[in-house]
């Protein structure tokens, strides 16, 4: 099932990203720059290791992990978090925990698009990606 997520995905729509970043405590200047970028996400698999790369004019990040195994992650906004990614009902669910807080990043495929739903407290952001040929 995870194979359906593999490939290169380009951001085409974003709703409430600034509110989500504000909820995380991201500063104004960083939010302004991050809101303007249109990142590309590349999801690859090598054996049982998944790699998720995000490339943008703002910042490039890369994480590699096994489904269901906790790992240390430094986020694009420099938070040091404990992360775990699971496959749940056809969705890739990425949970980040730090300093008594948590946020979820849920990726699902709807009508050939990758929908990323980011949740922190009451802040919910939806980002839509289309697969590149």
From Swiss-Prot:
Octadecanoate binds at residues 127-129. The modification Phosphothreonine is found at residues 8, 30. GO terms for molecular function: cytoskeletal protein binding; icosatetraenoic acid binding; long-chain fatty acid binding; long-chain fatty acid transmembrane transporter activity; oleic acid binding. PROSITE patterns: FABP. Hexadecanoate binds at residues 127-129. The modification Phosphotyrosine is found at residue 20. The keyword Phosphoprotein applies. This is Fatty acid-binding protein, heart. It comes from Homo sapiens (Human).
